[in-house]
């Protein structure tokens, strides 16, 4: 067993980014910076939930990761599966304990999110489209958690909708990228059922829907600062163009990375709008 596997299996960079999105979500909701204690707790609750989710996902995804991600800790033997299971539960427990320090509502929201993460990894992930919706919903509620922690939704509500929509697109594109390994496992993902081309059209629909939804605050009278979202929308549209043009593994990988980047850039665009 490798000690570094306890960090590696959580995907710490992703967890830190998720925590940051939660923190920025609270700032988007308030239109200002909340007190330091809330910021720290939101960051930790979201990061620990993400860490637990990634770990339990690797536990249930062991067989497919032997094909698609052989370098990860479990398939390469750096950590045994039983240890990964208990480690994920420990991370969830610590996150819930910290959520209680925010509020009962924040605790309940975190509990629901953590249960969804477990169910996604255990049962929902192989289900065509339902698994995509589940993980996209978890991404969408990340900035919303920060808003709940400060007791105000504000622009964070629209941000959550956009994050959900673009992540549905990204999850479908990721399935297009992983078709080879999923076929060997016998998974029934959307690209396997519909074909890569039709799945790309579905992903494109959600990508374009994100762009449309991103302009809802403009109709509500949000100031010119909100137009910081325009470059993000262009990135999303370019990712859509790529996956419609070609559905090979390399192109799908590039497209999903662009969609992933757009999620984080959108948070900053909404933050600019909220602060201005």
UniProtKB/Swiss-Prot annotation:
Keyword Lipid biosynthesis set for record: yes
Its annotated pathway reads: Membrane lipid metabolism; glycerophospholipid metabolism
| Reaction equations catalysed | sn-3-O-(geranylgeranyl)glycerol 1-phosphate + (2E,6E,10E)-geranylgeranyl diphosphate = 2,3-bis-O-(geranylgeranyl)-sn-glycerol 1-phosphate + diphosphate
GO cellular component entries: plasma membrane
Ordered alphabetically, the record's keywords are:
Cell membrane, Lipid biosynthesis, Lipid metabolism, Magnesium, Membrane, Phospholipid biosynthesis, Phospholipid metabolism, Transferase, Transmembrane, Transmembrane helix
Cofactor needs: Mg(2+)
For membrane topology, the record states: Multi-pass membrane protein
Gene3D superfamilies reported for this sequence = UbiA prenyltransferase
Transmembrane feature ranges: 12-34, 38-60, 84-104, 107-127, 146-166, 202-222, 224-244, 256-276
EC number, UniProt record = 2.5.1.42
Q: Which GO terms describe its molecular function?
A: geranylgeranylglycerol-phosphate geranylgeranyltransferase activity; magnesium ion binding
Pfam families in the record, alphabetically? UbiA
Highest taxon of the source?
Archaea
Which GO biological-process labels does this protein carry?
glycerophospholipid biosynthetic process
- On whether Magnesium is a keyword of this UniProt record, the answer is yes
Compartmental location? Cell membrane
Q: What does this protein do?
A: Prenyltransferase that catalyzes the transfer of the geranylgeranyl moiety of geranylgeranyl diphosphate (GGPP) to the C2 hydroxyl of (S)-3-O-geranylgeranylglyceryl phosphate (GGGP). This reaction is the second ether-bond-formation step in the biosynthesis of archaeal membrane lipids.
What the entry lists under NCBIfam families is as follows: PRK12883.1
Give the similarity note.
Belongs to the UbiA prenyltransferase family. DGGGP synthase subfamily.
| This protein's name | Digeranylgeranylglyceryl phosphate synthase
Q: Which organism is it from?
A: Thermococcus gammatolerans (strain DSM 15229 / JCM 11827 / EJ3)
């Amino acid at each position: 067993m490798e000690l570094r596997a306890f960090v590696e299996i959580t995907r710490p960079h992703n967890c830190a980014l998720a925590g940051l999105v939660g923190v920025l979500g609270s700032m988007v909701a308030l239109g200002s910076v909340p007190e330091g204690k809330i910021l720290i707790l939101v960051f930790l609750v979201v990061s620990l939930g993400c860490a637990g989710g990634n770990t339990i996902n690797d536990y249930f995804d062991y067989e497919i990761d032997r094909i698609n991600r052989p370098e990860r800790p479990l398939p390469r033997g750096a950590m045994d599966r039983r240890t990964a299971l208990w480690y994920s539960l420990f991370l969830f427990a610590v996150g819930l304990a910290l959520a209680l320090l925010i509020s009962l509502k924040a605790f309940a929201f975190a509990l629901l999110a953590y249960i969804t993460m477990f169910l996604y990894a255990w049962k929902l992930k192989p289900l065509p489209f339902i698994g995509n919706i589940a993980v996209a919903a978890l991404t969408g509620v990340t900035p919303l958690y920060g808003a709940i922690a400060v007791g105000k939704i504000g622009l964070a509500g629209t941000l959550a909708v956009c994050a959900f929509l673009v992540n549905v697109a990204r999850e479908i594109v990721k399935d297009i990228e992983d078709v080879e390994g999923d076929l060997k496992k016998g998974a029934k993902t959307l690209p396997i059922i519909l074909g890569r081309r039709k799945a790309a059209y579905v992903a494109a629909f959600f990508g374009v829907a994100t762009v449309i939804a991103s302009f809802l605050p403009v109709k509500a009278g949000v100031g010119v600062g909100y137009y910081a979202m325009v470059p993000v929308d262009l990135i999303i549209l370019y990712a859509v163009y790529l996956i419609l043009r070609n559905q090979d593994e390399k192109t799908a990988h590039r497209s999903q990375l662009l969609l992933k980047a757009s999620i984080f850039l959108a948070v900053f665009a909404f933050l600019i709008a909220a602060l201005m």
